A protein has these predicted regions:
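Helix-turn-helix DNA-binding module
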Residues: 51-68
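Generic leucine side-chain signal with a strong bias for well-ordered alpha-helical environments
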Residues: 13, 44-45, 62
Length: 93
């Protein structure tokens, strides 16, 4: 995942949290996937990006360390990027 792709995914997740993104279907797919496979990733996406909670509060609320937070965040962002690329919303670079 390139820096530009990561920036784009983060921006679209935040916009979706504010009801301003056409990525809603892609994000819903990722949330459904993580509901079954990794609830921590799902909660991280929900709290950090859709609800706009600060990183420090997300770490505390999920009872995880920063290393785990960054690992799970990258995993979740990558999954959203894969769904977005498959839908033609994110060019693969």
């Amino acid at each position: 995942m390139t820096r530009e792709q990561k920036r784009r995914v983060r921006a679209e997740l935040r916009a979706c949290g504010q009801g301003k993104s056409d990525w809603a279907g892609v994000i819903a797919l990722a949330m459904d996937y993580y509901e079954a496979e990794d609830p921590v990733c799902r909660r991280l996406l929900q709290l950090r990006y859709l609800d706009g909670m600060p990183e420090e509060r997300v770490v505390a609320k999920l009872h995880i360390g920063r290393t785990t937070y960054y690992h799970k965040e990258l995993e979740a962002l990558s999954t959203v990027a894969v769904y977005a690329a498959a839908a033609g919303l994110l060019p693969s670079q």
